[in-house]
């Protein structure tokens, strides 16, 4: 019983922690730790389960789509941040060497000797 209660409390705590939180390295590390801990707790749960345990597990599974939506939001924020960093780096390099990406469209070769 205590494993299911711990799983429920950890899941509820994690949902509260990531809900609307801005992306940060600490949050990503907390999510990784939570997922490892949660995986261990799920592996330790053994049947038969009482009615209260079944209800708590149902509540945990009901929180799952909410957690997934928040994780998707955080993933999109990280993608956007990486894209902006890549664009800034490209702009910075274009100011340093503006002729690096020149094409040779307008050149021709003179065949006369």
Swiss-Prot record:
Residues 25-91 form a coiled coil. It is found in: Cytoplasm, Cytosol. Its main location: cytoplasm. GO terms for biological process: bacterial-type flagellum organization. It comes from the Bacteria. Keywords: Bacterial flagellum biogenesis, Chaperone, Coiled coil, Cytoplasm. GO terms for cellular component: cytosol. Belongs to the bacillales FliT family. May act as an export chaperone for the filament capping protein FliD. This is Flagellar protein FliT. It comes from Bacillus licheniformis (strain ATCC 14580 / DSM 13 / JCM 2505 / CCUG 7422 / NBRC 12200 / NCIMB 9375 / NCTC 10341 / NRRL NRS-1264 / Gibson 46).
């Amino acid at each position: 019983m205590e494993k299911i209660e711990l799983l429920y409390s950890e899941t509820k705590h994690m949902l509260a922690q990531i809900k609307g939180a801005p992306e940060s390295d600490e949050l990503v590390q907390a999510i990784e730790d939570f997922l490892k801990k949660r995986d261990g707790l799920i592996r330790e749960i053994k049947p038969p389960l009482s009615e209260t345990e079944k209800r708590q597990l149902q509540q945990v599974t009901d929180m799952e789509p909410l957690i997934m939506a928040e994780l998707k939001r955080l993933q999109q924020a990280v993608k956007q941040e990486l894209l902006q960093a890549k664009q800034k780096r490209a702009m910075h390099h274009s100011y340093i060497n503006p002729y690096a990406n020149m094409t040779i469209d307008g050149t021709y070769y003179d065949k006369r000797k």
